[in-house]
Amino acid sequence: MQTFKKSFLLFSPLFLLLFGCATIQKIGFSQREKLLSAHLKEWENIQIDGIIELNYRGFSFRKNVVLKKMGDRGRIDIFDSGVFGLKPNPFISAYYDSTLFVRLPEQTKFVEINNSSLERELPDLSFIKIFDELVSNKKKILIEKEYRNKDFIFYFSDEMKLEKIELTQENFYVLFDYLKELSKISIFKNSKEIANIQIDKISYKNIKIKSL
């Protein structure tokens, strides 16, 4: 009898774990719909502050970065020093509306990236215009946990958070990692990580993008 009691006490945590896993309820459709709507809403206007590490074609650095998205417009500024330093001038900047403009360290003005070798090296940023399309296709996302068109595939987690964007015509994809909220963005080309952003702060209000 004592042996039975000892065996029961030894295995009871395992029984509880298995029973608990068996009785966990999946998130219902209506709850997932609320989660998806809230998550897509966050991506309408967003500012991300963090540290970017880039290592691509001999171009390597680790610097402060600020990403902003407002509707169909986006901007990224990479700073040579801290954002709140004495001279917080961007080291590299990129602006996207319907066309991509970039200002590199040796340039004083933004240059339109159009039919150039640099354009072929950069991912297609028009995916920032697709979020309205995602909203209008929520039912499809809820069922399949993804949305695709001829250019992109958006993958979503069980919690209805965006976890991957794949560029179907190119060898680029972007991964999104979460703790309580978005904590890291990783960019891959040809299955090799070329950049990642460790996120320090996310804002959803009072976002301003300086036009060119």
Predicted features along the sequence, with ranges:
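Gly/Pro-enriched, hydrophobic low-complexity segments
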Residues: 139-212
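N-terminal leader/targeting segments and the immediate start of mature chains
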Residues: 20-72, 208-212
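Hydrophobic membrane-embedded alpha-helices
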Residues: 134-138
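An acidic-aromatic
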Residues: 73-129
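A short, sequence-level motif marking secondary-structure junctions
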Residues: 67-70, 97-99, 114-121, 158-159, ...
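Sec-dependent bacterial lipoprotein signal peptides
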Residues: 1-21
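Solvent-exposed loop/turn segments connecting transmembrane beta-strands
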Residues: 55-60, 81-87, 192
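One face of beta-strands
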Residues: 44-52, 61-67, 72-78, 92, ...
